[in-house]
Curated annotation (Swiss-Prot):
The name this protein goes by in its record: Uridylate kinase
Class of the enzyme per the UniProt entry, highest EC level: transferase
Record-level GO BP terms: 'de novo' CTP biosynthetic process; UDP biosynthetic process
Function: Catalyzes the reversible phosphorylation of UMP to UDP.
CDD domains listed in its UniProt record: AAK_UMPK-PyrH-Ec (cd04254)
Lineage: Bacteria, Bacillati, Bacillota, Clostridia, Eubacteriales
Length: 235
């Protein structure tokens, strides 16, 4: 049997992806389907870390008239709801997990400790990172880049609602062009909406490739881990 291309991965799942067609809150069927896809990767022996967004409950930048710092902290708390929901779905399918938060809330999760996170991964536990970086003004994409660098992940899998990176929104422009491969400088200079410039710069500086792919297609996470050509690769 072919071996996975990557031994340790960082999977970034947006809050919107967890909401499914509802676009708000958590959709049980969607989370269970995502968990089944993750199980396929887990069964290959791959070490999996996950960063979840919180956009299905709250977006810091959408809090008009609100103090930005307060709005961002509200968004961090939203990621905890998603992390616990995903943890429950993963464990119901037999995968051991740990949730680590960048803001301490010991009654429901471990505080983020790098060495502990790495040890969990080595013991084949899935680690879910919540609360972003614990600091306002930083996105969960930046969290994924930062944690990936800290735990020595070999790749970031960026699960989106579209099947890659386009030169314009494919939902609006039917003639939008999809990119198979991009450089980090393309992402930073062209503002293609893959991730913010802080996250892209972190990945560039630490030589962490990013694979952007559609989460809605079953088996895509496995395909990415096995090295098949899907979505858009940024490197």
């Amino acid at each position: 049997m072919q071996k996975p291309k990557y031994k340790r991965i960082m999977l970034k799942i947006s809050g919107e992806a967890l909401a499914g067609e509802k676009k708000l809150g958590l959709d049980t069927d969607t989370i269970n389907e995502i968990s089944r896809n993750i199980k396929e990767v887990y069964d290959l022996g791959v070490e999996i870390a996950i960063v979840v967004g919180g956009g299905n409950f709250w977006r810091g930048r959408s809090g008009k008239g609100m103090d930005r710092t307060t709005a961002d902290y509200m968004g961090m708390l939203a990621t905890v709801i998603n992390a616990l929901g995903l943890q429950d779905a993963l464990e119901s399918q037999g995968m051991p997990t740990r949730v680590q938060t960048a803001i301490e809330m010991r009654q429901i999760a471990e505080p983020y400790i790098r060495r502990k996170a790495v040890r969990h991964l080595e013991k084949k536990r899935i680690v879910i990172f919540a609360c972003g970086t614990g600091n306002p003004f930083f996105s969960t994409d930046t969290t994924a880049a930062l944690r990936a660098a800290e735990i020595d992940a070999e790749v970031i899998l960026l699960a989106k609602k579209v099947d890659g990176v386009y030169d314009s929104d494919p939902n609006i422009n039917p003639n939008a062009k999809k990119f198979d491969k991009l450089s980090f400088m393309d992402v930073i200079n062209k503002g293609l909406g893959v991730m913010d410039s802080t996250a892209a710069s972190l990945c560039k500086d630490n030589n962490i490739p990013i694979i952007v792919f559609g989460l809605n297609e079953p088996g895509n996470i496995v395909k990415a881990v096995m090295g098949e050509k899907i979505g858009t690769i940024v490197m």
